[in-house]
Amino acid sequence: MERLISHPPLMIVSDLDHTMVDHQDHENLSLLRFNSLWEYAYRRDSLLVFSTARSPVLYKELRKEKPLLTPDIIITSIGTEIAFGNSMVPDHAWVESLNSCKWNREIVLEETSKFPELTLQPKTEQRLHKVSFYIDEGKGEALTKELSQLLEKRGLDVKIIYSWGKNVDVIPRGAGKGEALEYLLKKLQAEGIFPVNTLACGDSEHDAELFSIPDVHGVMVSNSQEELLKWRSENALNNLKVIHSTERCADGIIQAIGHFNLGPDLSPRDVSEFLDRKMDNVNPGHEVVRFYLFYERLRRGEIKNYETYIASFKDSCLHAAVLFHPSGAEKSLRDTIDELKKCYGDKRGKKFWVWVDQVLVTDTIPGKWIVKFDKWEQCEDESQCCKTTVEFTSKGGDLVWEKVKQIWSEESKVKDDNSSWIL
């Protein structure tokens, strides 16, 4: 968040499973639409927050399975853990806040052991301020009421969350997705970067707390669970800041951005024109997003008159522009782009997608910029990522590529110098 110098125009706080991530969308099209929009229009000065019931361990597993962007802040384990940045640095003040609650894991484990219908979830899901169980179908509501009374008699003040008809989570009363968001908003206000607008996004009763916070916009995606929609009808039906979208998952989030006029809602993936590249219309971050969309579509064989586009991009490179390939080879950038003609349609019919993450633009001197980002490629089930740096310069009112340097990311599944990685 160090890049922020003023109040972010928008902070999106989104659940992951069945909200940001559509597990029925095997091509991840809605997620990729959101990714392009965020990196193009929002990454520079806004905040992306994921709020999930997953533990940090399961969150990292999801990142390996789906093309998730890197959030600025991650709230995990049903709001009991908060971390910042790519390194997921824990918020120790939040931990101390929960430590001060009437909470004792040993007492929770002692009392829950009296219920044979409860089975502890794997160790990865047992956290400092969360104890999680599976429960026999149909027994959740009665058990949670009885367990709540037992824990209250033992001096604890807890929330017991029954979800999906099979999960029971016990957390401190002061924890939860809503409480974590309220804490986060106060923290941002104290740091002078309180967001102008906040959009909360969810699909299940786990997320209901997010929609109860004053002055926060909310979207319940079209595929939301009946329990959440029932909660809305009883608690938020007349709240004009909370809508039930007509689109699923990430598409519903984009729809809400437009509905509330929170900023641009046209994803670059919905635009087919790549040639409008004057400085008045594009910045270096935009150029990166658009180029790699072009690159993806070219290799998928989806662009008519692709040679015209290749010629245009080639002309946007200095004659001496250079590419430092992750293999260690040094190549002419103009020649590399020209050779893309040979790759047209080589990924046709395959699950081939390209996206960029953490696009950061830095002004060096007037008329020169450095753009750093992660460039990802996925072909079928194989993913590769390079840490990428591009140097741009201004020439005659146009944005010109000067240098591209790529090195393999530690997250990349494939780090050999195979020939499929071009740029």
Curated annotation (Swiss-Prot):
Keywords: Hydrolase, Magnesium
CDD domains linked: HAD_SPP
Top enzyme class: hydrolase
Gene Ontology terms: biological process: sucrose biosynthetic process
Domain of life: Eukaryota
Keyword Lipid metabolism: no
EC code(s) of this entry: 3.1.3.24
Record GO terms (molecular function): magnesium ion binding; sucrose-phosphate phosphatase activity
Enzymatic reactions: sucrose 6(F)-phosphate + H2O = sucrose + phosphate
PANTHER family for this protein: SUCROSE-PHOSPHATASE 2-RELATED (PTHR46521), SUCROSE-PHOSPHATASE 3B-RELATED (PTHR46521:SF13)
Quaternary state and interactors: Homodimer.
Listed name of the protein: Probable sucrose-phosphatase 3b
Native source species: Arabidopsis thaliana
